[in-house]
Each structure stands twice: as C-alpha cells, then as structure tokens.
C-alpha cells in the first residue's frame, strides 16, 4: 500500500508540474509570414524540460516513420520536403504520437539537404508529441491570451556560471573517490582515535605488546603501540581524580573524530619509507661509483649461432667469436676501411695507380653505356638525336634519282639590274606584242 501511495504522489507531482505554463525564459520568437512573430520552444529546451519533469530515465522517443515528400534540383541546388512521425513514451506505458515536417531550400550539397530536412522533421515531431502532455511542455504556446500577457513579463538572462561546467577534473575526482572507497572496504575498519581515561594512562602493561599486522596492496607492516612511561608512585591527587570520574569519560567517542592516521602509524610509515630510500640510495651510489672508476661491462661480438649460448651464459668456442677488424689476405687493401676520409692523389701515386680518369670516362656514353671498339679514346662518341618515324616523314621529303646523282649547278637568271635611283624600267620581251 505504501508503494501505491508513493507512486500516486509521484504522478500528482508530475501532473502539477505539467499544469504550469512556461516562463519567458523558455519561449523564443521568430518572424513568421508577413510581419507577424511566432512564439515557439527550441528543441533542446523541450528535452531539458522533459528530463526535469519525467526524469532522465522516465521517458523515451521512437521514430515511427520518415517520408521524403519531394526532391527538386535546379541549377545544382536541392530543395527537399520531409515528414516524420515520432512517439514519446513514459515509463508507465503512456505515450503521445504526432507528425512533424521539415524543409530545406537551395542547398548546394545533396547529403546536407537530406540531413537538415530529416533532423528538422524529427525535432518538430518530437516537440509536437511532448506538447500533448501539458502546458509545461509547450501546449501553452497556442494560447493567444497567454502570449499577449507573457510578453510584458520581464526577466534577467541567467549569468554564466563557470563552476557549473562539467570538466574532466570532475570525472577524475569521481574516479579517485570510488577507488578510495574500494580501498577502504578492502582494508577493513579504519583506525579511529579514542580518548584514553586516566585508568588506561596509569595502567601498567602486564604482558609485552602484541604485534598487529595491516595489509595494504599486498604489503604487510608491523605496528607496535607506543609505550607509555608510568611512574612507580602515584600522587594522592591522581587517585582521587580516578575515583571521581565522570560517566561521560567512559563513553567511547571514537565516531566523533576523523579517520586520520595515528602518530605511531606515521612513525612506522616514515621508518619504512626511510629504509626504502636508503636501499635506493645505496644502489644508486654503487652505480655511480662503478661509473666513476671506469668499469665498463664487457661487449663481445659473436656469430648468430653462438648468440643463444651467450644468452644462456654458456662458454663460447673460439671459432664463434667475431672479429670486426679482420682483413682477408686474398683481397688487396689499398684504402683504410676503418676511417672515412677522401682518397688523395698522392696515395694513388704511392700505390702505383693512375689518378687520371679521363680515359676511363671516355669509354662510356653519357648514360653509362659502354661504347663500341671502333671509337677511339681521343674522340668521344656523341650520340645523335633520334627522331621518330612520323617526324622524319614530315621533315624529310622523298628524293628522286636525279637528286640522288649529285648536286647540280643552279641556272643563272639574268634579270633587270638597277643602275639608277627611282622606279625600274620594264624591259620589252620579244614574245610580247604591242597592242595599240
């Protein structure tokens, strides 16, 4: 019966929120047909309102259908009209379903036109479906009297709150907190301070203190309680104070203090840390001393077959050792291979080698091809430029037998010679008749 009542109270609370009308902070306006202004609620604001009223897990959406009504292309630009049907369902099974429409005009890219049209249609259908639940989700925007009065309500835009931003540091802090909680559960109950009574302070330990062990990350540390010095003779004032104790002093008030580590724990932790630091410092000192004395680990070159035996620290046969300075006697070594230096002409003369390389270069064509034996060394061969068959046909005409016989002297033509300045005279030819 209590669950039913709580569920009923939850529904009444949701219904009360849905009956309220929207404030001016949630209402936006745009220019409609002509000079009129249309009031509407943006999609992201409608989603935030639904999360506040129903809860982030109290409602869901479902796209039932998406239809392309038209697609026009003119001069490389696209215009699309799209229809979408969306259903909004609540956790108890209640749902609202409505239709939305989206259009895009004169879009250059086809894919972008489809994307904008479909998103606009789905968002419109979502807002119209949420409107069916009540005034708080946009149904009040269809009341003209309400719109006429809401314009007179003044409001201050919300200030930007930098502390309300979701930052990566917040996520890291949450992860660290969860890790700390997990470590606390694995370690067991934490040590807490408690006030010691006078009897505890003056009590003489009858047995040696027992060693307690505490595991943290698979490491065991020994903790010994602090020894308390007790005087042999107690003053009468202390005895009377022990007899006159307040009952509140006997109460264990360990829950009223923080979970800080006790002083003896801090001493033990510092001792362990100092031991580790001393060990690390000794290792570092040994390494530095070896480097200072010049001790270098031996380096050995071996063959591939002897590498496995070297890894297993087995004895290596003498034949498997690799000598990087070995020089074969069958090869004539004229240049020191261990040094990268240019070869001088004096060294070639000492070795009896010819330093002139022009005779060597003349034996090869420009592209590195060796020339035939008919060419001499003094006259290097120069390859003539090659022409294709089509170029030869265009540039070189065919010759007759008379032309191939040999060159013939050109006939000498006697023409008029100019001896005076001015216009040359026309000579009368014998074959031409004078026509009167």
From Swiss-Prot:
Designated name of the protein: DNA repair and recombination protein RAD52
Subcellular compartments: Nucleus
Bias type Polar residues, positions: 208-219, 230-242, 372-401
Record keywords: DNA damage, DNA recombination, DNA repair, DNA-binding, Nucleus
Gene Ontology MF: a single term: DNA binding
Pfam family, one: Rad52_Rad22
Coiled-coil ranges from the UniProt annotation: none
GO biological processes: DNA recombinase assembly; double-strand break repair via single-strand annealing; mitotic recombination
DNA-binding region: 127-131
Biased amino acid composition, Low complexity: 402-417
Encoding gene, per UniProt annotation: RAD52
Function: Involved in DNA double-strand break (DSB) repair and recombination. Promotes the annealing of complementary single-stranded DNA and by stimulation of the RAD51 recombinase.
Quaternary data: Part of a complex that includes RAD51, RAD52 and RAD59.
Region (Disordered): 180-252, 367-436
């Amino acid at each position: 019966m209590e669950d039913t009542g709580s569920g009923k109270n939850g529904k009444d609370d949701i219904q009360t929120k849905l009956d309220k009308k929207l404030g001016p902070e949630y209402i936006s306006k745009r220019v409609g047909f002509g000079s009129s202004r249309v009031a509407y609620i943006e999609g992201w604001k409608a989603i935030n309102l639904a999360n506040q009223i129903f809860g982030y897990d109290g409602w869901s959406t479902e796209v039932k259908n998406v239809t392309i009504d038209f697609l026009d292309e003119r001069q490389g630009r696209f215009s699309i009209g799209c229809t979408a049907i969306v259903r909004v369902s609540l956790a108890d099974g209640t749902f609202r379903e409505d239709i939305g429409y989206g259009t895009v005009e004169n879009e250059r890219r086809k894919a972008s036109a489809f994307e904008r049209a479909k998103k606009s249609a789905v968002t419109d259908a979502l807002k119209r479906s949420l409107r069916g639940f009540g005034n708080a989700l946009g149904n009040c925007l269809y009341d003209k009297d309400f719109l006429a009065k809401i314009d007179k309500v003044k409001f201050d835009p919300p200030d930007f709150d930098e502390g309300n931003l979701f930052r990566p540091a917040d996520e890291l802090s949450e992860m660290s907190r969860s890790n700390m909680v997990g470590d606390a559960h694995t370690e067991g109950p934490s040590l807490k301070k408690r006030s010691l009574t006078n009897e505890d302070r003056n009590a003489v330990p009858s047995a040696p203190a027992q060693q307690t062990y505490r595991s943290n990350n698979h490491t065991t540390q020994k903790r010994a309680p602090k020894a308390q010095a007790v005087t042999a003779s107690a003053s009468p004032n202390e005895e009377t104070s022990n007899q006159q104790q307040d009952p509140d002093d006997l109460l264990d008030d360990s829950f009223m203090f923080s979970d800080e580590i006790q002083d003896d724990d801090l001493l033990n932790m510092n001792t362990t840390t100092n031991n580790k630091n001393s060990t690390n410092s000794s290792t570092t000192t040994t390494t530095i001393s070896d480097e200072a004395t010049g001790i270098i680990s031996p380096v050995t070159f071996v063959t591939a077959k002897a590498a496995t035996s070297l890894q297993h620290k087995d004895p290596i046969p003498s034949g498997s050792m690799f000598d990087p300075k070995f020089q074969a006697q069958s090869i004539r070594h004229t240049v020191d291979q261990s040094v990268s230096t240019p070869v001088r002409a004096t060294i070639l003369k000492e070795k009896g080698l010819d330093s002139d390389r022009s005779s060597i270069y003349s034996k090869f064509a420009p592209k590195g091809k060796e020339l035939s034996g008919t060419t001499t060394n003094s006259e290097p061969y120069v390859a003539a430029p090659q022409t294709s068959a089509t170029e030869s046909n265009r540039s070189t005409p065919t010759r007759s037998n008379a032309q191939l016989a040999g060159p013939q002297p050109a006939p000498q033509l006697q023409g008029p010679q100019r001896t005076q300045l001015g216009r040359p005279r026309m000579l009368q030819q014998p074959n031409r008749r004078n026509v009167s």
